[in-house]
Design a protein with these regions (language model features):
Chain B
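Non-catalytic interaction/Regulatory regions outside core domains
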Residues: 1-89
Length: 124, 89
């Protein structure tokens, strides 16, 4: 199953120019599956960075607007888009000029993969 | 700003045969949507305009028309804003 998922993710990665990495991790930021190219920044793929999303959505939910679904962080050279699919976190790392809206569209395409992975994570 | 874009979209949607429109910024994020159109298509519309512009990089941004038997979608980029208009043939 892992190979199939990796293949699908690689296809998605190659379909968007400027997208460097797609990473699916658990709520602690531990990577479950990851596809990347050589431009992906190492630091943004570490659990220390990924797990801050969990804290951010906890804080964000206190704004009274419901649970955050997506977090977009725009940096000078990169943008990091994280989706709340708890118990999973989906992270996209892309260049700053990459089409953010197009990456957000991938959510529906990832849904079948995520439902499979969620089953695995909740069982373990 | 919203009022201005709302007015533009109202003008567009009141044109004959037009049933929807979407406006997208340079990052593919939805600026506004009116009628029978989805804000989820914003990113794809931006990407289509980007890819089509790469065919002739020296020229002005192209007008892209996609049509089927009954409907058509017209996409055009002007500066940082891309607009898509859906209309019946």
């Amino acid at each position: 199953m892992a190979e199939e998922i990796r293949k699908i993710l690689e296809q998605l990665l190659n379909s968007i120019s400027g997208l460097y990495c797609i990473l699916i991790s658990d709520r602690d930021g531990v990577p479950i599956i990851m596809v990347q190219n050589d431009k992906a920044p190492e630091l943004a793929m570490k659990p220390a960075f990924l797990s801050t999303f969990g804290l951010a959505i906890d804080r964000g939910s206190k704004l009274g607007l419901g649970k955050p679904k997506t977090l977009i962080c725009s940096y000078s050279q990169y943008q990091v888009i994280q989706m709340n699919k708890l118990p999973l976190i989906v992270t996209f790392i892309a260049s700053d000029c990459c089409n953010t809206g197009y990456i957000l569209c991938l959510e529906t395409q990832l849904e079948p993969i995520l439902s499979n992975l969620t089953l695995v994570v909740t069982e373990t | 700003m919203e009022k201005h874009i709302e007015r533009v979209m109202d003008d567009i949607i009141s044109s004959p045969n037009v049933f929807g429109c979407v406006f997208v910024d340079h990052q593919g994020l939805c600026l506004g949507v009116k009628g029978d159109a989805s804000n989820e298509s914003a990113g794809i519309i931006g990407a289509i305009a980007d890819q089509a512009a790469k065919l002739e990089p020296q020229s002005q941004p192209p007008i892209i028309v996609m049509e089927d038997d009954t409907k058509s979608c017209i996409i055009h980029r002007n500066g940082t804003v891309t607009g898509a208009i859906y209309k019946t043939n």
